[in-house]
Amino acid sequence: MLLDNFYTLLSSESPDSITWTIRVELNPEHAIYQGHFPEHPVVPGVCLLQLIKECAEDIRRQQLQYTQVSSCKFLSVVNPVKTPCLSVTLTLKDIEEGKLQLQAEGTVKVEGTVETEETAENECFIKLKAVLTSTKA
C-alpha cells in the first residue's frame, strides 16, 4: 500500500472472477488531509486512482501499473468525514499477456438517505477506463 493507513479494505466479492465489488473505509484522520484541505478534507483524485490500482493488485495478486488511461471522470468530491465508506466496482479483463483492461466505477452513499443496502441512494464519484500492466516484480 502506497499510503499507509489511508484506507481499510472491508470486503471484496465477485460472482464471476471478472467483475468485483470492493468496499473500503477511508481514514479521515490520515495526514494527507492536513494539506488537502484542513477544514474541508477532500480525497485527492490521484489517491482514488491509487486505491483502485491497489484493489486490482490485491485481486490479481501481482504488482500493476497504469500504462493507459483512456477515460477518467471525477464526478463528485469525496469527503472522508461525511462519506468514509466507498464502493468500487471493478471489471478486469486480460487483453494480452501481462495487460489488463480495467473499468471502474466508484460510489458513495448519498448523505441523508437510509443506510440499508436495498434502499440507500448512491452517488457516483469516479468512472475510469484504463489499461494496467504487470510490473513482474
Model-derived features with residue positions:
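Intrinsically disordered, low-complexity acidic/polar segments
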Residues: 31-33, 81, 97-99
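Acidic, aromatic-enriched beta-alpha/helix-loop junctions
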Residues: 38-59
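Hydrophobic beta-strand-centered segment that forms part of the acyl-chain substrate-binding groove
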Residues: 53-91, 96, 123-129
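Generic structural detector for well-ordered beta-strands
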Residues: 23-25, 73, 131-133
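Catalytic strand-loop segment that frames the active site of acyl-thioester-processing enzymes
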Residues: 1-43
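Intrinsic-disorder/low-complexity, polar/charged segments enriched in Ser/Thr/Lys/Arg/Asp/Glu/Gln
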Residues: 17-21, 47, 85-87, 127
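Surface-exposed loop/turn and secondary-structure junction residues enriched for glycine/proline
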Residues: 35-36, 40, 46, 75-77, ...
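HotDog/MaoC-like acyl-thioester-processing domains
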Residues: 19, 91-137
